[in-house]
Amino acid sequence: MRAVRAETRARELFRDAAFPASDSSLFYNLSTPLAQFREDITWRRPQDICATPQLFPDNPWEGQVKQGLLGDCWFLCACAALQKSRHLLDQVFPPGQPGWSDQEYQGFFTCRIWQFGHWEEVTIDDRLPCLAGRLCFSRCQREDVFWLPLLEKAYAKVHGSYEHLWAGQVADALVDLTGSLAERWSLKDIRKASGQQDRPSGGEHRACQQLLRLKDQCLLSCSVLSPRAGARELGEFHAFIISDLQELRSQTGQGILLLRIHNPWGRRCWQGLWREGGEGWNQVEPAKESELLAQLQEGEFWVEEEEFLREFDEVTIGYPVTEAGHLQSLYTEKVLCHTRALPGAWVTGQSAGGCRNNSCFPCNPKFWLRLLEPSEVCVAVLQRPRRRLVGQTRALAGASPAPVNLPGKDYQAVGLHIWKVEKRKISLPRVLSAPPVAGTACHAYDREIHLRCELSPGYYLAVPSTFLKDVPGQFLLRVFSTGKISLSAVRLATKGASPGAALPAGEWETVQLQGSWRAGQTAGGSRNFASYPCNPCLPFSVPEGAGPRYIRITLQQHCRLSDSQLHPIGFHVFQVPADGEKQDACSLLLQEPLLSCVPHCYAQEVSRLCLLSAGNYRIVPSTYLPDTEGTFTVTIATRIDRQSIHSQEMLGQLLQEVSFMAVMKA
């Protein structure tokens, strides 16, 4: 934020060069209906849209979400969760920022978005997309309130463009805006489990009763995945907000459960029995009808339980977050006040073992989970989306629109299983051949999957997996518990000679090089990632001699996370061509390495003894995952082959010259 203020001093109002007011911020590949408005969209600041812009209104309803031309109802439904808890809104939209009437106003705002385990600050200018002088994407019920379109712009910046927000999951946006967990209940699956296809089952009724209990604590959303005959007004692939639930009695004494649904489109699209003037109201007293209809705001309507279960496909529920930032259980209302998280990865040919149907399932990443007391535990696996190709505006040159990207395209089918073990030293085949104490019902193409269980004290082995083997990916394992826990990765055994193994006898010249991995700068991760060339590239040379020389290269990390956790590290060595002294590091690192010390191992140090010819080389040390910070030392020991000399003064005994450099003996 300090850098932004410095830039604004040289200009009248801040202009965000990283997310400019241009087509590159609006579109990804012109694959959505948004493309037809390309020539008509202009950018305006709030003070150019209305006379007295404000961030938040005094009346909460005036700040309610309303959808525009962009198909991001999933994101807007999640935004409604922020209005239920002021501390959540303050977390995402830090208070105290200068507004349009303040002297300190400089044309920018800062939001916080939760991304892969961390809250990231996202600063934007306040130029917003408009059509005919009005906001064309999200807006609040009162159009001079701007917290929502500004947050939408920040979220679009995180994703790369507004068009990237077309279609998504409410659950994903809820996690990004709260840092918590979200559950998706398939109403169709609940009905299948009960064996009743024609009418609501006991399981569905219990689900609605649970929604009634949770209505004041967390965001409730419902979605239509395909339209039904006679109810096409709900649309297809559209998300709604469940604003309220009311349990009442009919005039004959029967129980009735009504759900108040808010359509982000901002219009009442429901023509069911409980619409205004509908037949359903004949079942209740006129006074009750008037009371409930008076509660409806723009875009809201009442639906009875049976209609709701018939017409909607899915319900999404966000876990409540306390003011202290702890999750609260949806099932017991207990506070999950102990949290741990660790990153991991599935590496093709190494740790991407696939599901339990595959013989290489034991190769998957494994984690130790220790509980110190009986606890309610939620364990989640959050996938990092595969990065889209760089150059997102390539399709803007006049190419025909590409097919709309479908939700889930960027994610693998992922599952999670947990085994109880007696101690940390185990027979892995024996443990994995037994039934797990907890596991996901199936592998799902969701960004995040999780399971909830009651666990007794002791050690547990958690194994996240993709359904298919040799499918690469990164993930974050998150654990939330009512009791004290510890979480650590199972270390991979380092193959080959140990790092501290003795060198062959003789004289060795040693050189030590210091370096560091810095997120966003020099922490590029392994060669599986496009950011690999960002890693430190350390030069060394082998002098001319009678032939190839023995070289021992040792990489030692100084980035221990705890007594039981180390980063996975490794290195590659590249030979510089004789005519390639001026070759840049990036192009050199795109070639095949001459030798490698991989797979990356959870070890304090790793090393490789090799024979190298005279020439120039580059060592590239790396952690497996990008943006993993730490410092390291690379030690290069070169064998010096010196000829023995005879000395008459020593009566024919052999002497060796003593180098001023370090002498290392076996």
Swiss-Prot record:
Q: Which CDD domains match?
A: Calpain_III, CysPc
Q: Where in the cell is it found?
A: Cytoplasm; Nucleus
**Origin, by domain of life?**
Eukaryota
InterPro entries cross-referenced by the UniProt entry? C2_III, Calpain_cysteine_protease, Calpain_domain_III, Calpain_III, Calpain_III_sf, Papain-like_cys_pep_sf, Pept_cys_AS, Peptidase_C2_calpain_cat
- What keywords are annotated for this sequence in UniProt? Cytoplasm, Hydrolase, Nucleus, Protease, Repeat, Thiol protease
Tissue distribution of the protein: Ubiquitous.
State its role. Answer: Calcium-regulated non-lysosomal thiol-protease which catalyzes limited proteolysis of substrates involved in cytoskeletal remodeling and signal transduction. May play a role in insulin-stimulated glucose uptake.
- Name under which the protein is recorded: Calpain-10
Which gene holds the coding sequence for this protein? Capn10
